[in-house]
Amino acid sequence: MKFPILIINLKAYGEAAGKKALEIAKAAEKVAKELGVNIAVAPNHLELALVAQSVEIPVYAQGADVETPGAYTAHIAVDNIKAVGASGLILNHSEAPLALNQLSKLAARAKSIGLDVVICAPDPVTSLAAAALGPHAVAVEPPELIGTGKAVSKYKPETIIETVRLVTKHFPNVVVITGAGIETGEDVEAALKLGTKGVLLASAAVKAKDHYQKIFELAKPLTVAAEPP
């Protein structure tokens, strides 16, 4: 997993249903290539295979609930995420929380088969617990700010600062990214200045009238923070 990174979660928005998901992913891919930055997209499970097989940028699943394939009606197996071409997995989003035991098993399975693993957490202490599971990144997202347009980097910077401090101290190999209310390039820039290595966002990009233009704005700050090759 490369950093700094912009991860665009398409959730189950109507604006990202079917071929619309691919249109957003293509716009993200274009921006990633033009700016030379890392952008990943996380389509809904219905569009995961389509998007993963159509773009070169990383494509992440929004979640999973079983480790391996089998007789699990309406479930999502970690191994099948890899099989359809996705390269990563987001776990424990506040809209899809997991019990600790299940989260631990899913994260371990995903890492064992080579998937990037991002675990979401609502606060610094929970982020530290998530980091103990060995993901590539922890995304700290105060749930009360998600979808509000009130960026965590501006309204709760102390949450980011403390998360970065705790995780860096105890699990230096785990990267901290952040999300919740991120709407503008300025919000992204602020998050990076607070010590994160990227952002996880959704509505700002998905609901934009011009996906390319908005993603370009959101990704531009990554060029300043980009790590040398």
From Swiss-Prot:
It comes from the Archaea. The keyword Nucleotide-binding does not apply. Substrate binds at N9, L10, K11, I146, G181, A202, S203. GO terms for biological process: gluconeogenesis; glyceraldehyde-3-phosphate biosynthetic process; glycerol catabolic process; glycolytic process. Its EC number is 5.3.1.1. The active site is at H93 (electrophile), E141 (proton acceptor). It catalyses: D-glyceraldehyde 3-phosphate = dihydroxyacetone phosphate. It is found in: Cytoplasm. CDD domains: TIM. GO terms for cellular component: cytosol. Pathway: Carbohydrate biosynthesis; gluconeogenesis; Carbohydrate degradation; glycolysis; D-glyceraldehyde 3-phosphate from glycerone phosphate: step 1/1. One of its GO terms (molecular function) is triose-phosphate isomerase activity. The keyword Isomerase applies. Transmembrane segments: none annotated. InterPro entries: Aldolase_TIM, TIM_sf, Triosephosphate_isomerase, Triosephosphate_isomerase_arc, Triosephosphate_isomerase_AS. Keywords: Cytoplasm, Gluconeogenesis, Glycolysis, Isomerase. Involved in the gluconeogenesis. Catalyzes stereospecifically the conversion of dihydroxyacetone phosphate (DHAP) to D-glyceraldehyde-3-phosphate (G3P). HAMAP family: TIM_A. Belongs to the triosephosphate isomerase family. Homotetramer; dimer of dimers. This is Triosephosphate isomerase. It comes from Pyrobaculum islandicum (strain DSM 4184 / JCM 9189 / GEO3).
